[in-house]
Amino acid sequence: MIPLVLEESGGSERVFDIYSRLLRERIIFLGEQVTSDTANRIVAQLLFLEAEDPEKDIYMYINSPGGSVYDGLGIFDTMQHVKPDIHTVCVGLAASMGAFLLAAGTKGKRSSLRHSRIMIHQPLGGARGQASDIRIQADEILYLKERLNTELSERTGKELETIKGDTDRDFYMSPQEAVEYGLIDLVLDKKPVKNI
């Protein structure tokens, strides 16, 4: 169930779901696995907020175990495409594609709450069918692995070989370790946005 928020102004009352109310304050919340529905919603929100005010920053709070690489890359590309700076904030867990999107925020504006966890690893996948079909899928997963590792290398300042080694298996970090790694820029104790 999605909580509702009652807002009173000028003698009238309006009811919003909490996510719509947060969006009015330029806050996007990714609190689930990355799927095509999730990606379509977040891409639409990013484009809407850019159209509303291309000069005003956007805040994206992330609590996600990851999900679809293709859908996550759609969000990532849109984050790079829109004009506003994007603050990313890890709340709870940013794993796999969640961590990738956390690192995709504007440099200097990527953060985490202090008890969150961040995890990077290589893309997961599987294939069935004829040998030639399996080969096609394997080649695609290797391509995606290289693409994600290259982006992480650029965003963290780490050598590509270091990223490849670290993402070979699940690699968990505390927020402070993620700062040292270059995935984020600061650990938050205070709220980075105005009261809503």
Curated annotation (Swiss-Prot):
Active-site residues, as the UniProt record annotates them: 96, 121
GO molecular function: ATP-dependent peptidase activity; ATPase binding; serine-type endopeptidase activity
Location of this chain's protein in the cell: Cytoplasm
Entry annotated with the keyword Protease: yes
UniProt GO cellular component terms: cytoplasm; endopeptidase Clp complex
Pfam families: CLP_protease
Reactions catalysed, as given in the entry: Hydrolysis of proteins to small peptides in the presence of ATP and magnesium. alpha-casein is the usual test substrate. In the absence of ATP, only oligopeptides shorter than five residues are hydrolyzed (such as succinyl-Leu-Tyr-|-NHMec, and Leu-Tyr-Leu-|-Tyr-Trp, in which cleavage of the -Tyr-|-Leu- and -Tyr-|-Trp bonds also occurs)
Domain of life per record: Bacteria
Keywords for this protein: Cytoplasm, Hydrolase, Protease, Serine protease
EC number: 3.4.21.92
A biological process from GO: protein quality control for misfolded or incompletely synthesized proteins
Assembly notes: Fourteen ClpP subunits assemble into 2 heptameric rings which stack back to back to give a disk-like structure with a central cavity, resembling the structure of eukaryotic proteasomes.
Function: Cleaves peptides in various proteins in a process that requires ATP hydrolysis. Has a chymotrypsin-like activity. Plays a major role in the degradation of misfolded proteins.
Matches recorded under HAMAP family: ClpP (MF_00444)
Family statement drawn from the similarity comment of this UniProt entry: Belongs to the peptidase S14 family.
Protein name: ATP-dependent Clp protease proteolytic subunit 1
Source organism (scientific name): Prochlorococcus marinus subsp. pastoris (strain CCMP1986 / NIES-2087 / MED4)
